């Protein structure tokens, strides 16, 4: 696969292959990196065609990216309170050209807004 050249990869970051249809993820080895638990968790999530998914504490965005790669869910939202992690996850979404199906939001949902779909 060809990596987009309009996505910034900082010197302290690395790009890892998710071994799923050429999908990649940006990670900072000095910060949190996803583990096998995230991959296993994404395997347990049964997402049906047309469903929306919310991943709380998305970190690197690994779960929404994996679920978008392997399911027919409509939209995947990753919610992350750490600015740096949210920004890095957003770049991973762009790197994989998944912005139509995956969005990363920084902050927390304190508004009590209703969520329809699957909560991961």
Task: Indicate residue ranges for each PLM-predicted region.
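Class I SAM-dependent transferase core
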Residues: 5-48
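Short, Lys/Arg-enriched N-terminal segments with co-localized hydrophobic residues
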Residues: 1-2
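Conserved SAM/SAH cofactor-binding pocket of Class I
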Residues: 43-120
């Amino acid at each position: 696969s060809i990596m987009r050249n309009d996505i910034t990869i900082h010197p302290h970051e690395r790009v890892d292959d998710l071994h799923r249809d050429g999908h990649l993820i940006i990670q900072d080895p000095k910060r949190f990196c996803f583990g096998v638990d995230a991959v296993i968790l994404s395997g347990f999530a049964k997402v049906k065609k047309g469903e929306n998914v919310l991943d709380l504490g998305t970190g690197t965005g690994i779960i929404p990216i994996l679920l978008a790669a392997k399911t027919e869910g409509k939209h995947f939202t990753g919610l992350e309170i750490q600015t740096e992690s949210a920004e890095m996850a957003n770049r991973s979404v762009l790197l994989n050209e998944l912005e139509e199906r995956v969005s990363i939001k920084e902050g927390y949902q304190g508004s009590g807004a209703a969520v329809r779909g699957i909560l991961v």
